[in-house]
Amino acid sequence: MRKATITRKTKETAIEVAVDLDGTGVSQVATGIGFFDHMLDLLARHSRIDIKVKADGDLHVDYHHTVEDVGIALGQAVKQALGSMAGITRYASLYMPMDETLTRVAIDISGRPALVFKAEFPRDKIGEFDTELVREWFNAFAGNAGITLHVETLYGENSHHIAESCFKGLARALRAAVAIDPRAAGEVPSTKGQLGG
């Protein structure tokens, strides 16, 4: 069973996260940040990974700590659920349209964390949500999941659509990359015989 639960508690946040990589895309998300909840719901639905997130953060300060810490915990949960990574497809790439916006996402579940994130938002905020936090979340997630992740919005005019195409693109890429390849016969997809380092 490719499942994991992570609890993260600091002076700034208390986070509980659970994932099931072989789920159906069910989400139970409560961060206190409406737009962020929407993005995490999309992530679950389009990746077909069951995701539970309960976050209590210092929202009276701003949303930064909560968004980043959820990224950390969710990344750790995905990494733990992947285990030895035996039999996974490992790589995926795609283009994700969202109305006038087009984003390209490529992923390598390599065990070597790296993020290249290129998206420009026309506005500083989506409602009360700072658009710079989109990159912060992706950085925290990729770093803690141990994945190499490239996200590039090729064009777009609406900040909501740009953010949504990034999250949906990640979701669909994750869905493909974590899938078990029946032809791999349980082997780790690396000539080294292991992933990471």
Curated annotation (Swiss-Prot):
Name under which the protein is recorded: Imidazoleglycerol-phosphate dehydratase
UniProt-annotated location(s): Cytoplasm
Key words of the record: Amino-acid biosynthesis, Cytoplasm, Histidine biosynthesis, Lyase
One Pfam assignment: IGPD
The protein's Enzyme Commission number: 4.2.1.19
PANTHER family the UniProt entry points to: IMIDAZOLEGLYCEROL-PHOSPHATE DEHYDRATASE (PTHR23133:SF2), IMIDAZOLEGLYCEROL-PHOSPHATE DEHYDRATASE HIS7 (PTHR23133)
Gene that specifies this protein: hisB
Family recorded in the similarity comment: Belongs to the imidazoleglycerol-phosphate dehydratase family.
Keyword ATP-binding found: no
MF terms in GO: imidazoleglycerol-phosphate dehydratase activity
Annotated Gene Ontology cellular component terms: cytoplasm
Domain of life of the native organism: Bacteria
Major location category of this protein: cytoplasm
Pathway: Amino-acid biosynthesis; L-histidine biosynthesis; L-histidine from 5-phospho-alpha-D-ribose 1-diphosphate: step 6/9
A GO BP entry: L-histidine biosynthetic process
Catalytic activity: D-erythro-1-(imidazol-4-yl)glycerol 3-phosphate = 3-(imidazol-4-yl)-2-oxopropyl phosphate + H2O
